[in-house]
């Protein structure tokens, strides 16, 4: 849960909106949680990368990969946690919320 909290801290620092955490344990063999969030402005997307790097250094976790720099969808792979940070339009287009609508949500704020 520490990794999830760090990811949420980074998103909140970037003023992300409509943050949802989908529990994909036992459903997806590659990661346990997927975070979906919306950026109010495109410049927030790239700010997330810097903020996640700061959180990673501070909390001692590794960023496996980060893709989508300069696009409208940033995907950050934190091993067991994936962050999907979209513009509003891209989030509607790809609609991960619909794809994972049958999966449980982790409530915010995250408790230890």
Task: Mark where each language-model region is.
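Long, contiguous binding/interaction regions
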Residues: 1-26, 40-47, 54, 59-73, ...
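A short, glycine/Asx- and small/polar-enriched loop/turn
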Residues: 29-32, 77-80
